[in-house]
């Protein structure tokens, strides 16, 4: 720990005696980078959690496979159009582009997303040290401690470990670079100017560019312009000359009213070589001699400083003051004009509207009482400062009951607000009193870096969508770190050596505690489960964290636990419409589910998902018209909700209202062009409607939008199979296996192999499918069927018999057993299996017809021809198009010598299958027999 310690007498240090830190810049940078990596190294193992899912995984502007479109500059951070009424209006296109670059270079691997965040945090830490060294402390040791405190502070965990926190981290980096560029643009060598001229327009323009980039990464980046201007105003870079009778400021030659330079200002260029950044001067030097300044009186503003300020702002010398202020005014006019333009652009691209938030997001802003809003907003400022001072309780979400409203002036929490107000007032007075002394710029810089970046989150100018958000403290924490280290150095200077050593040891301990806390917080951000569970443990009175944890549990299929946390959320916040809606989806009792949906709609009549769920429930109850109305309402209030379009269109198609279904699908694709599910469902509809060519295009679009959409890939394979393009079908099935090697994908591939005679490959595929889902009856039955065809009848019989023991009413099992026994020439067992199948009394006449036909075959094999004929007769009675049964009946009559009857049956079968060679051969045989009989009769007659 390197803290400089001034002379205890409080004397002013000479510029030439600037203390230096023993650390070389490279060593300090290595230590800071190492500390940052040690604290956040564990976050590299994290997955996409919380807002990452919506900003990256589900964001159409970020998703891999989607083309890079100009719409990225018209959409918000989550991929919605900024003009959309449901948009959060968070315009961060450069941050979104950084996500796209991540995906382009390394794919959707979260490791590299986290790695970029950690690297950016390291860079911010290093640039902060450089900034503090060159413009704030002019002391490398203090700058190092400031940056080290910033590097390990636990409140940064959300910004660094959460991938969407990149907006804050990258904006902070650009914020610092813009500030440094602004300082670099000032003339550091104008020895007598109260306000330096703009020496480098390039760096001034670069500052504007970097500040704009910071704003396009996150909105708070725009506050750098305010920091630059106020810092420029209150820390002028002229060189102060302290004379016994006052101070004189040198103006440029030829300027009216310019005093002559004093003897102490004879070597301005020598001084300018010593310091690149602002030099020491005062506004007091711009005027006539001032009264001698007495020794420090303990009052924050000395009489000399106050006299200087009064003379600057009033009196007969205002003309000279304005002349000295001219360089600053030029810069200020440029910056303010530029900020006005980009703010106008920002409002224009939002459609001139502000985001709409709910009471859950920011309860205080919905209070009807001005006093409640004022007291709560004020207390939240103190609460945020407390998070910086003592980051003990940290949580990813502070909404809905985390911080109760401050509704009365007698609330004890107002003491924290008053204390903060007093401290900020004293610090502000200190800045005003010491604005003419270089050694007191630390407090000014600390306050500016603390206050300005927090203004957009303060509810001062507009309502924000959160109560407290730890990641928005990433930028303001720079100011806190500067003030903390400055106060530490002042304390150290006023203590004895022993006291200073104890203070430094305490600081080291604090840094170690902060580091440990940061490492532990990183573990929380590793997965959705650990994050959401930590919220419940940290803020059990927060309804939102219970709701989020319940959502996670529902996704994991842990429904009982999910129901418990949904109900807990409702106890804490009974007006939580989404919790009621989700609770309804988990309830098995349809009446209870309907009650939950209706309650949700009473609280929020435009809740599109509750409308959707209630509509589907009524659809299942065959209340078609009510369901259609609710689904249309769901689309009305959620035009980007793709599931509602699919559900409504499928319902209309079931009602044979195909034109309306087509229109709904078209509207859905127009409003949700990036929904792969919607394209897939529309393709299924087109196949059923007889437009397979159009369906191919939508299947391919679904796959392009989501290459991992294995359902669309399999459906496309099935479509090609139905079109007879088996090679293409096999290609798509194999592609689906690369995405998801599941039984659902293996099954159609096995069927393709079986139906094309590739039985060995079919057997391998079905064996793998059964190993993945051994309990699925259809797969085991298909495997048994392949085994039977390949002659492995014993194994086939074993599998089929096992299925029958589990499901005695398995009709297909009995049919397969009959085929297996027939192949084994156990016709009695085959007949017995068919009899059992007939006893199940299937409803489909064609199925019964096939069973009678099979029974007839087994009877015929046992030479029970009359009974076989009866079975065939029963088959054709149920299904007159059963050509094989007609032919077999003809064959029996043929064998029995009833040739006339046989011919009738053969001819009936031939009408059904006119190209049957077997029938023609049988008829030819019958003709020959009849001719022989005729010849025999003729010979007998002769």
From Swiss-Prot:
| Enzyme class, broadest EC rank | transferase
Sequence intervals crossing the membrane: 21-41, 110-130, 141-157, 160-180, 197-217, 332-352, 374-394, 415-435, 442-462, 464-484, 499-519
Cytoplasmic face residues? 1-20, 131-140, 181-196, 353-373, 436-441, 485-498
Q: Which compartments does it reside in?
A: Membrane; Endoplasmic reticulum
The Gene Ontology biological process annotation of the record reads: protein O-linked mannosylation; RNA processing
Main subcellular location: membrane
Repeats (TPR): which ranges?
A: 543-576, 577-607, 608-641, 642-675, 676-709, 710-742, 743-776, 777-810, 811-844, 849-882, 883-916
Pathway noted in the entry: Protein modification; protein glycosylation
Q: How does it sit in the membrane?
A: Multi-pass membrane protein
Q: Where is the composition biased (Low complexity)?
A: 250-266
Question: Where in this protein does the record put region Disordered?
Answer: 245-285
Keyword terms of this UniProt record: Endoplasmic reticulum, Membrane, Repeat, TPR repeat, Transferase, Transmembrane, Transmembrane helix
Q: Which PROSITE patterns match?
A: TPR, TPR_REGION
**Sorted alphabetically, which InterPro entries does this protein's record hold?**
HAT, TMTC_DUF1736, TMTC_O-mannosyl-trnsfr, TPR-like_helical_dom_sf, TPR_rpt
Q: Which residues lie on this side of the membrane: Extracellular?
A: 42-109, 158-159, 218-331, 395-414, 463, 520-942
Q: Which catalysed reactions does the entry list for this protein?
A: a di-trans,poly-cis-dolichyl beta-D-mannosyl phosphate + L-seryl-[protein] = 3-O-(alpha-D-mannosyl)-L-seryl-[protein] + a di-trans,poly-cis-dolichyl phosphate + H(+); a di-trans,poly-cis-dolichyl beta-D-mannosyl phosphate + L-threonyl-[protein] = 3-O-(alpha-D-mannosyl)-L-threonyl-[protein] + a di-trans,poly-cis-dolichyl phosphate + H(+)
Q: Which GO terms describe its cellular component?
A: endoplasmic reticulum; membrane; mitochondrion
What is the purpose of this protein? Transfers mannosyl residues to the hydroxyl group of serine or threonine residues. The 4 members of the TMTC family are O-mannosyl-transferases dedicated primarily to the cadherin superfamily, each member seems to have a distinct role in decorating the cadherin domains with O-linked mannose glycans at specific regions. Also acts as O-mannosyl-transferase on other proteins such as PDIA3.
| Subunit structure, as described in the record | May interact with FAM168B.
**What family does the Swiss-Prot or TrEMBL record give for this protein?**
Belongs to the TMTC family.
In its UniProt entry, what is this protein called? Protein O-mannosyl-transferase TMTC1
Q: Which gene encodes it?
A: Tmtc1
